């Protein structure tokens, strides 16, 4: 039987309404922190309220609103490794690549402790999940597929949203993004829960039926 005894909390941070996630298994004292944004204080408050340490910091991609909290998280939890897709790792140190320079600021992050590749399986904090690379919004965007759950769930960053998809006009590719969504998300069960980098959660089935940018075939 699938083990669904887990908790997930979302912290939405201004100014980009970016979603950070804290994920942990019931009965454990460590958690995964995904895409720490500007509001690290609220992330830490959730960790402290649940008496959790940080097992790892995961970035779905390297855009500044999703990596800006990395430095504060690493300072607070220095033993927690930082993981990001291999093809977005350069964004951590390059304000042009992570788009913060376009806003007149220079956001940088500590370097990755581990770079992730498509198809890799990661085991952390009692979880086992698959990395799937879906470029198009950024060169190395990855999603984390927790296929051990019923229904499965995906932490998807800015690849797909409820009723929309990630921007492709900042050095991305719409055909590449749509192809990746169909190949690596729409092949999952319709009940799969999608936790995006902005906005509310949705499901694979809902997006296949109604997403105006990329319908299921």
Predicted regions located by residue number:
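Active-site HxH/HxHxD metal-binding segment of metal-dependent hydrolases
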Residues: 38-123, 152, 209-216
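Conserved S/T- and glycine-rich ATP-binding loop of Class I adenylate-forming
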Residues: 23, 60, 134
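Metallo-beta-lactamase
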Residues: 29, 52-54, 96-101, 121, ...
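Conserved beta-strand hairpin/beta-sheet module of binuclear metal-dependent hydrolase folds
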Residues: 2-50, 143-157
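Short Pro/Gly-enriched beta-strand edge/turn motifs at strand-loop
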Residues: 1-7, 100-104, 126-127
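Hydrophobic residues at beta-strand termini and immediately following loops
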Residues: 11, 116, 134
């Amino acid at each position: 039987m699938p083990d669904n005894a887990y908790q997930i909390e979302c912290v939405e941070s201004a100014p980009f309404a970016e979603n950070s996630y804290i994920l942990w298994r019931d009965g454990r004292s460590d958690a995964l922190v995904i895409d720490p944004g500007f509001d690290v204080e609220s992330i830490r408050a959730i960790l402290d309220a649940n008496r959790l340490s940080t097992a790892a910091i995961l970035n779905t991609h390297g855009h500044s609103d999703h990596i800006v909290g990395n430095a504060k998280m690493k300072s607070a939890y220095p033993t927690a490794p930082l993981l990001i897709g291999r093809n977005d790792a350069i964004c951590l140190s390059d304000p042009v690549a992570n788009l913060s320079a376009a806003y007149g600021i220079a956001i940088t992050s500590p370097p990755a402790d581990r770079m992730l590749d498509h198809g890799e399986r990661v085991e952390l904090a009692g979880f086992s999940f698959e990395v799937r690379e879906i470029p198009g919004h950024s060169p190395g965007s990855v999603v984390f597929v927790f296929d051990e759950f019923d229904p499965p769930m995906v932490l998807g960053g800015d690849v797909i949203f409820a009723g929309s998809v990630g921007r492709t006009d900042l050095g991305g590719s719409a055909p590449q993004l749509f192809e990746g969504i169909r190949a690596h998300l729409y092949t999952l069960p319709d009940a799969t829960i999608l936790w995006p980098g902005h906005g509310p959660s949705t499901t694979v089935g809902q997006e296949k039926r109604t997403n105006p940018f990329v319908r299921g075939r």
